[in-house]
A protein has these predicted regions:
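Bacterial N-terminal signal peptides that target proteins for export
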Residues: 2-16
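Flexible "cap/lid" subdomain of the alpha/beta-hydrolase fold that forms the substrate-access gate
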Residues: 35-55, 64-66, 106, 113-149, ...
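Conserved HGGG/HGGXW glycine-rich cap/lid loop of the alpha/beta-hydrolase fold
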Residues: 70-117
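Generic short N-terminal amphipathic or hydrophobic helices
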Residues: 5-6, 18-19, 38, 63
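Boundary at the C-terminal end of the N-terminal hydrophobic targeting segment
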Residues: 28-34
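Bacterial N-terminal signal peptides
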Residues: 16-27
Protein backbone atom coordinates (compact mmCIF):
# COMPACT_ATOMS: atom_id res chain seq x y z
CA UNK A 1 0.00 0.00 0.00
CA UNK A 2 2.65 2.47 -1.03
CA UNK A 3 0.82 5.70 -1.74
CA UNK A 4 1.77 9.33 -1.98
CA UNK A 5 5.42 8.63 -1.27
CA UNK A 6 4.57 9.50 -3.78
CA UNK A 7 2.11 12.43 -3.26
CA UNK A 8 2.32 13.64 -6.84
CA UNK A 9 2.42 10.11 -8.27
CA UNK A 10 -0.69 8.99 -6.38
CA UNK A 11 -2.63 12.02 -7.54
CA UNK A 12 -1.64 11.48 -11.15
CA UNK A 13 -2.42 7.76 -10.95
CA UNK A 14 -5.91 8.48 -9.69
CA UNK A 15 -6.37 10.87 -12.56
CA UNK A 16 -4.96 8.39 -15.06
CA UNK A 17 -7.34 5.65 -13.97
CA UNK A 18 -10.26 8.04 -14.21
CA UNK A 19 -9.23 8.97 -17.74
CA UNK A 20 -9.25 5.35 -18.82
CA UNK A 21 -12.88 5.03 -17.88
CA UNK A 22 -14.24 8.53 -18.41
CA UNK A 23 -12.49 9.56 -21.62
CA UNK A 24 -13.33 6.54 -23.73
CA UNK A 25 -15.25 8.87 -26.00
CA UNK A 26 -12.01 10.53 -27.08
CA UNK A 27 -11.19 7.38 -29.10
CA UNK A 28 -7.50 7.33 -28.33
CA UNK A 29 -6.89 11.08 -28.54
CA UNK A 30 -4.53 12.49 -25.93
CA UNK A 31 -6.27 14.17 -22.99
CA UNK A 32 -5.79 17.93 -22.84
CA UNK A 33 -5.07 19.89 -19.65
CA UNK A 34 -8.70 21.00 -19.78
CA UNK A 35 -9.81 17.36 -19.88
CA UNK A 36 -7.62 16.55 -16.88
CA UNK A 37 -8.96 19.50 -14.90
CA UNK A 38 -12.54 18.55 -15.72
CA UNK A 39 -12.02 14.94 -14.63
CA UNK A 40 -10.21 15.91 -11.43
CA UNK A 41 -13.09 18.26 -10.62
CA UNK A 42 -15.58 15.47 -11.24
CA UNK A 43 -13.67 13.10 -8.95
CA UNK A 44 -13.48 15.67 -6.15
CA UNK A 45 -17.18 16.50 -6.53
CA UNK A 46 -18.21 12.85 -6.28
CA UNK A 47 -15.92 12.09 -3.34
CA UNK A 48 -17.22 15.09 -1.39
CA UNK A 49 -20.89 15.05 -2.39
CA UNK A 50 -23.45 14.69 0.41
CA UNK A 51 -24.99 11.22 0.63
CA UNK A 52 -28.17 10.73 2.62
CA UNK A 53 -27.44 9.30 6.05
CA UNK A 54 -23.65 9.48 5.66
CA UNK A 55 -21.63 11.87 7.81
CA UNK A 56 -18.00 12.89 7.46
CA UNK A 57 -15.47 13.87 10.09
CA UNK A 58 -11.77 13.85 10.80
CA UNK A 59 -10.34 11.47 13.40
CA UNK A 60 -6.90 11.79 14.97
CA UNK A 61 -5.17 8.41 14.98
CA UNK A 62 -1.56 7.25 15.15
CA UNK A 63 -0.19 10.72 14.37
CA UNK A 64 -2.38 11.44 11.33
CA UNK A 65 -5.78 12.99 10.61
CA UNK A 66 -8.06 10.40 9.01
CA UNK A 67 -11.23 11.33 7.18
CA UNK A 68 -14.07 8.87 7.75
CA UNK A 69 -17.51 8.39 6.26
CA UNK A 70 -19.91 6.92 8.79
CA UNK A 71 -23.53 5.88 9.04
CA UNK A 72 -25.72 4.05 11.53
CA UNK A 73 -25.26 4.33 15.25
CA UNK A 74 -26.07 1.58 17.74
CA UNK A 75 -25.27 -1.70 15.98
CA UNK A 76 -22.00 -3.64 15.72
CA UNK A 77 -19.27 -1.72 13.92
CA UNK A 78 -18.34 -2.71 10.38
CA UNK A 79 -15.03 -1.21 9.25
CA UNK A 80 -14.70 -0.93 5.45
CA UNK A 81 -11.11 -0.70 4.17
CA UNK A 82 -10.71 0.36 0.54
CA UNK A 83 -8.01 -0.70 -1.90
CA UNK A 84 -5.93 1.10 -4.51
CA UNK A 85 -6.50 3.58 -6.10
CA UNK A 86 -9.68 4.21 -4.15
CA UNK A 87 -11.23 6.01 -1.19
CA UNK A 88 -14.23 5.73 1.12
CA UNK A 89 -16.36 6.43 -1.98
CA UNK A 90 -15.84 2.87 -3.22
CA UNK A 91 -18.10 1.73 -0.36
CA UNK A 92 -20.93 4.24 -0.84
CA UNK A 93 -23.54 1.61 -1.72
CA UNK A 94 -22.44 -0.83 0.99
CA UNK A 95 -22.45 1.92 3.63
CA UNK A 96 -26.14 2.62 3.04
CA UNK A 97 -27.11 -1.07 2.89
CA UNK A 98 -25.22 -2.02 6.05
CA UNK A 99 -26.57 0.95 7.99
CA UNK A 100 -30.10 0.02 6.91
CA UNK A 101 -29.43 -3.52 8.20
CA UNK A 102 -28.67 -2.13 11.65
CA UNK A 103 -24.89 -1.83 11.67
CA UNK A 104 -22.68 1.09 12.54
CA UNK A 105 -20.54 1.57 9.44
CA UNK A 106 -17.24 3.44 9.07
CA UNK A 107 -15.28 3.76 5.83
CA UNK A 108 -12.03 5.71 6.18
CA UNK A 109 -9.83 7.31 3.59
CA UNK A 110 -6.73 5.27 4.35
CA UNK A 111 -3.30 6.83 5.05
CA UNK A 112 -2.17 8.67 1.93
CA UNK A 113 -5.58 8.67 0.23
CA UNK A 114 -8.35 11.22 -0.18
CA UNK A 115 -8.53 13.76 2.63
CA UNK A 116 -6.46 11.73 5.09
CA UNK A 117 -2.92 12.82 5.94
CA UNK A 118 -0.31 11.70 3.40
CA UNK A 119 3.16 11.53 5.02
CA UNK A 120 5.97 12.22 2.56
CA UNK A 121 8.23 9.37 3.65
CA UNK A 122 7.67 5.92 2.12
CA UNK A 123 8.75 4.38 5.43
CA UNK A 124 5.56 5.72 7.00
CA UNK A 125 3.40 3.35 4.91
CA UNK A 126 4.53 0.00 6.30
CA UNK A 127 1.83 -2.50 7.28
CA UNK A 128 2.47 -2.23 11.03
CA UNK A 129 1.87 1.52 10.87
CA UNK A 130 -1.26 1.19 8.73
CA UNK A 131 -2.66 -1.43 11.09
CA UNK A 132 -2.00 0.93 14.00
CA UNK A 133 -3.98 3.63 12.16
CA UNK A 134 -7.04 1.36 12.22
CA UNK A 135 -6.62 0.33 15.85
CA UNK A 136 -6.32 4.00 16.77
CA UNK A 137 -9.50 4.63 14.78
CA UNK A 138 -11.37 1.98 16.79
CA UNK A 139 -10.10 3.56 20.00
CA UNK A 140 -11.19 7.04 18.87
CA UNK A 141 -14.63 5.69 17.99
CA UNK A 142 -14.95 4.08 21.41
CA UNK A 143 -15.31 0.62 19.88
CA UNK A 144 -13.72 -2.48 21.40
CA UNK A 145 -14.41 -4.74 18.41
CA UNK A 146 -15.34 -4.50 14.75
CA UNK A 147 -16.11 -6.62 11.73
CA UNK A 148 -13.22 -5.98 9.34
CA UNK A 149 -14.00 -5.85 5.61
CA UNK A 150 -11.24 -5.21 3.07
CA UNK A 151 -11.23 -4.99 -0.71
CA UNK A 152 -8.23 -5.35 -3.06
CA UNK A 153 -5.15 -3.95 -1.30
CA UNK A 154 -7.49 -3.25 1.59
CA UNK A 155 -7.83 -7.02 1.99
CA UNK A 156 -4.10 -7.28 2.64
CA UNK A 157 -4.37 -4.53 5.25
CA UNK A 158 -7.40 -6.31 6.72
CA UNK A 159 -5.63 -9.70 7.11
CA UNK A 160 -2.56 -8.21 8.70
CA UNK A 161 -4.45 -5.92 11.06
CA UNK A 162 -6.56 -8.83 12.30
CA UNK A 163 -3.44 -11.02 12.68
CA UNK A 164 -1.66 -8.29 14.66
CA UNK A 165 -4.70 -7.44 16.81
CA UNK A 166 -7.04 -10.47 16.89
CA UNK A 167 -8.82 -9.39 20.07
CA UNK A 168 -10.17 -6.27 18.32
CA UNK A 169 -12.10 -8.04 15.56
CA UNK A 170 -15.05 -10.41 15.60
CA UNK A 171 -14.96 -11.33 11.91
CA UNK A 172 -12.94 -10.74 8.74
CA UNK A 173 -14.11 -10.43 5.14
CA UNK A 174 -11.41 -10.25 2.43
CA UNK A 175 -12.78 -9.34 -0.99
CA UNK A 176 -10.93 -9.83 -4.29
CA UNK A 177 -7.60 -10.87 -2.73
CA UNK A 178 -7.52 -14.18 -0.78
CA UNK A 179 -5.18 -14.78 2.14
CA UNK A 180 -2.13 -16.74 1.03
CA UNK A 181 -0.09 -16.97 4.20
CA UNK A 182 3.57 -16.05 4.42
CA UNK A 183 5.35 -16.83 1.12
CA UNK A 184 8.62 -18.73 1.00
CA UNK A 185 10.06 -16.13 -1.38
CA UNK A 186 9.46 -12.41 -1.54
CA UNK A 187 6.67 -11.61 -4.02
CA UNK A 188 8.77 -8.66 -5.16
CA UNK A 189 11.55 -11.02 -6.26
CA UNK A 190 9.10 -13.24 -8.12
CA UNK A 191 7.41 -10.29 -9.83
CA UNK A 192 10.75 -8.86 -10.94
CA UNK A 193 11.71 -12.25 -12.37
CA UNK A 194 8.35 -12.64 -14.10
CA UNK A 195 8.00 -9.13 -15.53
CA UNK A 196 11.59 -8.03 -16.02
CA UNK A 197 11.54 -4.64 -17.74
CA UNK A 198 7.85 -4.90 -18.61
CA UNK A 199 5.36 -2.68 -16.81
CA UNK A 200 3.75 -4.07 -13.66
CA UNK A 201 1.95 -1.61 -11.46
CA UNK A 202 3.19 -2.97 -8.11
CA UNK A 203 6.82 -2.73 -9.22
CA UNK A 204 6.17 0.73 -10.66
CA UNK A 205 4.83 1.96 -7.34
CA UNK A 206 7.90 0.81 -5.48
CA UNK A 207 9.88 3.53 -7.23
CA UNK A 208 9.66 6.74 -5.17
CA UNK A 209 8.91 9.90 -7.08
Amino acid sequence: MRTKAIIGKASMDRLAFAMVFLLVGLEGQAATPADEKKIEGEIDMRMNSPIAGVNFRMIETNGISMRIAEAGSDGPLVLLVHGWPESWYSWRHQIAALAAAGYRVVAPDMRGYGSTTAPASAEEYDIVTIAADLIGLLDALGEEKAVMVGHDWGSIVAWQTVLFHPSRFSALVAMSVPYGGRPERSPMVEWREAYGDNFYYILYHNEPG
